[in-house]
Amino acid sequence: FSDLSDFDEFKLLDLRDFRNTMEAVNGVDEVYALAANMGGMGFITFHNADVMRDNALININTAEACYREGVDRVFYSSSACVYPTFMQEETEIKGLKESDAYPAFPDNEYGWEKLYSERVYQAYQKDFGLDIRIARFHNIYGPEGTFEGGREKAPAALCRKISKAKDGDTIEVWGDGKQTRSFCYIDDCLEGIYSLMRSDYDKPLNIGTDTAIVINDFVDLIADVAGKKINKKHDLTKPQGVRGRNSDNTLCERILGWKAKISLREGITKTYNWINGYKKEN
């Protein structure tokens, strides 16, 4: 943390406690509400009650505290998990538009809570004039993120597995590997958040890429970046989520003029190198 300025301050607080939330937002102009009890499919599939309870408390407290403290603007990090299951049952699907969220039928409780909390912030906007911005993230990844312990998402988990594997080894892939996803690198995501917060647009907006990849091909891409030949063993008993998910960024590009710039290969190269280097050092 040698590059921190005199204006950086860190507080480790449990935002399920309203008093802590009031302390966190006191004297703050803008709040970026990213706190959540979450993880990849392996976590959210088996922690439904924890995810719904903890995250609902965090976001209700954050909205109320921001209103009471007179925060100028609030960013809420929603998720592509809000989109209905019935629109994601095939591997080849059109990108999901913001309007597709209704009629609502998310794949899991994490998605239901995200959609509920969107409406919490919107309710505070309607009733109390809270100035809000909402982004629906589509699989954000990059260095410095969780890559082990059970909460990691697919890009980090696959990078870790391939980092540990030797050339010619076999790694476990959840599901049949035919699922499709799009992935957005963290730097692009941050640019999108900044653009949204500087805009006047106060409705939910996708932040992601519109280029989907088959998970089996994604594994091959990471292996190629690592310079290894990796075989796959598919475990059909493990959670695999919806069959296909991709982002429609038409609205985001029109409203913000924002579009992801970093290719999947470039982003995965940076992510893999960080995870691989971290494991070697530790």
Task: Kindly give the residue locations of the regions a language model identified.
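Conserved Rossmann-fold NAD(P)-dependent oxidoreductase catalytic core, especially the SDR/UDP-sugar
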Residues: 33, 60-108, 133
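NAD(P)-dependent short-chain dehydrogenase/reductase
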Residues: 86-95, 119-197, 210-212, 219-226
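C-terminal substrate-binding subdomain of Rossmann-fold SDR/epimerase-dehydratase oxidoreductases
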Residues: 164-282
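Active-site helix of classical SDR
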Residues: 109, 113
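Conserved cofactor-binding/catalytic machinery of classical short-chain dehydrogenase/reductase
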Residues: 17, 30, 58-61, 73, ...
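Helix N-cap/beta-alpha junction loops of NAD(P)-dependent oxidoreductase domains
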Residues: 38-43, 85-86, 143
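NAD(P)H-binding glycine-rich loop region in Rossmannoid oxidoreductase-like domains
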Residues: 4, 8, 15-55, 68
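Active-site loop/turn elements of alpha/beta-hydrolase fold enzymes
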Residues: 15, 36-37, 79, 137-140
